[in-house]
Design a protein with these regions (language model features):
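Long, basic/Gly/Ser/Thr-rich N-terminal segments
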Residues: 1-144
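N-terminal pre-Walker A segment at the start of P-loop NTPase domains
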Residues: 147-172
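Pre-Walker A (Motif I) flank of P-loop NTPase domains
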Residues: 173-177, 267
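P-loop (Walker A) phosphate-binding loop of NTP-binding proteins
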Residues: 182
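Conserved lysine of the Walker
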Residues: 187
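Post-Walker A alpha-helix
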Residues: 190-191
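Conserved nucleotide-sensing/catalytic segment adjacent to the nucleotide-binding pocket
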Residues: 201-204, 210-263, 269-270
Length: 344
């Protein structure tokens, strides 16, 4: 959708809106929640107050004309999760004024040709005054508040693919959550995000590459056997299943040896992240499993940006090995949820 279509969709969704509501829509589309963010305790307090008093029955995700969405409080996220995503979404927008003024021009054109039922002269004066004042943040009109009882927070649209996962975590409180999937699909990025949102440990399969003596032709030719899942089970999953601390010994690729162990205190919520982590010998330990995927074109583009010198190695070796593992054990079908990150 383009700016014109977004504006008309707003009018269709909220037929009683006023000009200032469209101004707010354009402001939010451009600047997101940058002007609203304070400390997390204050943000959480305000969200909790809205939870307790809100009359908004909408539970949808409302896309804006830019990088943000309106996530209505009734969607189902906890106060802590929503407040954290809200704060993570705040950022300084480059060229924001230029973007906003381009959108305002389209709004005026829709008013000028009578597509929108507002006075052109009055609207022009209001918008010029807004510009003179430096484009301050706009409130919803009294009419909009009375008719629609809006209750939402702005978050970046890159978090939308993971909202159902956040909702599951908030509702079910899993102890061990798995993230497997295709290379460059965002497994590490999701693990980092979950650690920002929740009090959890993240354990990576990349720390459990095979030691030199394990790299036999027989093993490397077997689907899913090119990681040390045996050591991962003993060092990480068995202690976690017993609610015990983990003595983590990472494999160092530069020295091709295992490092000295470091103590990871037990936490009730733990993330297992990486390719081959859904190995058939490990599945019994997981409360919930996520499979991340993406289209081939996006995968190649991300790998090229990550390390162009390694691209051919991924195409010729690592991607075929992953696909062999996925197909041999129906990994995608066995995971609880599939998330396509192609557009994330």
């Amino acid at each position: 959708m383009n700016t014109k279509e977004y504006i008309l969709d707003q009018f269709k969704t909220y037929p009683h809106l006023e000009l200032e509501d469209l101004m707010k829509f354009l402001y939010q589309s451009t600047f997101g929640c940058e002007h609203l963010v304070s400390d997390q305790d204050t943000v959480k307090k305000h969200i909790q107050q809205e939870f307790d008093t809100q009359m908004d029955s909408c539970n949808s995700i409302e896309y804006l004309d830019g990088d943000y969405v309106r996530l209505h409080l009734n969607y189902g996220l906890s106060v802590n999760t929503l407040s954290t995503l809200f704060i993570l979404s705040s950022q300084q927008e480059k060229n924001g004024i230029k973007q906003l003024e381009d959108k305002i021009q389209i709004l005026l054109e829709l008013i000028s040709n009578h597509t929108l039922p507002f006075s052109l002269e009055e609207s022009t004066n209001i918008l010029l005054k807004w510009k003179e004042d430096g484009y301050p943040a706009i409130h919803h009109s009294n009419t909009f508040n009375q008719m629609y009882h809006p209750s939402y927070r702005l978050i970046h649209k890159k978090y939308v693919p993971f909202l159902e996962l956040f909702k599951y975590i908030d509702d079910k409180h899993p102890s061990i959550l798995l993230i497997d999937g295709r290379c460059a699909s965002g497994k590490t990025t999701l693990g980092i995000l979950l650690k920002q949102v929740y009090d959890c440990n993240v354990f990576k399969m990349d720390d459990f590459f095979l030691q030199p003596h394990q790299r036999t032709n027989k093993r490397l030719e077997s689907p899913g056997e090119n990681v040390d899942h045996e050591r991962f089970e003993q060092e990480v999953l068995i202690p976690l299943s017993k609610h015990e601390d983990v003595n983590l010994s990472k494999f160092n690729c530069s020295t091709m040896s295992i490092q000295s162990p470091s103590l990871i205190p037990y936490k009730p919520f733990n993330i297992i992240e990486g390719s081959y982590s859904m190995h058939s010998n490990l599945q019994k330990y997981y409360d919930f499993s996520v499979f991340l995927t993406l289209n081939k074109e996006e995968q190649i583009e991300r790998l090229k940006k990550r390390n162009p010198n390694m691209l051919n190695n991924f195409i010729q070796r690592w991607i075929p090995l992953e696909e062999l593992y996925f197909n041999a054990f129906s990994i995608q079908d066995k995971c609880n949820i599939l998330i396509d990150t192609s557009k994330a």
